[in-house]
Swiss-Prot record:
GO terms for biological process: defense response to virus. Keywords: Antiviral defense, RNA-binding. NCBIfam families: cas_TM1810_Csm2 (TIGR01870). It comes from Methanocaldococcus jannaschii (strain ATCC 43067 / DSM 2661 / JAL-1 / JCM 10045 / NBRC 100440) (Methanococcus jannaschii). The gene is csm2. This is CRISPR system Cms protein Csm2.
């Protein structure tokens, strides 16, 4: 299976994201802000579309993880159709990073909920740094 992009987070950062608690909350916020800067070339509306897709996943549905995994081809599609070099590079980073996070969630509902919390912070910071709306 081909993978688009390389994860720009280290394993410890991914572990923090998927295991948010009161002791590491400030680190999570820093990670979200730093990633938002990395993804500044992605239009805010596109980032919001990805976030909305994740929000629509029903945690009570036994197939929630399958729906989450389908975010990978959605990211790949957006990467593939992008013609602007800078936006494409940012989408490549996003696809690689989220692919790695999704793999680490591995059907663990609590980790998924933590990812959604992190993604909310990322989208909030991204709105500040996004180059185009």
């Amino acid at each position: 299976m081909s993978k688009i992009g390389k994860c720009i987070l280290n394993p410890n950062e991914i572990n923090l994201i998927l295991n948010i608690n009161s002791q590491n909350a400030n680190e999570i916020i820093d990670i979200a802000e730093n990633l938002a800067k990395e993804f500044e070339q992605i239009p805010a509306t596109k980032m919001r579309d990805f976030y909305d897709y994740v929000l629509r996943i029903d945690e009570k549905n036994e197939n929630w993880y399958k729906e989450l995994v389908l975010l990978k081809p959605k990211l790949a599609y957006n990467y593939g159709k992008e013609t602007n070099r800078r936006k494409k590079e940012a989408l490549e980073k996003l696809a690689g990073t989220f692919s790695e996070i999704i793999d680490k969630i591995d059907n663990d509902l609590n980790k998924f909920k933590n990812f959604k919390t992190f993604f909310e912070a990322l989208v909030a910071y991204h709105k500040i740094y996004a180059k185009s709306q």
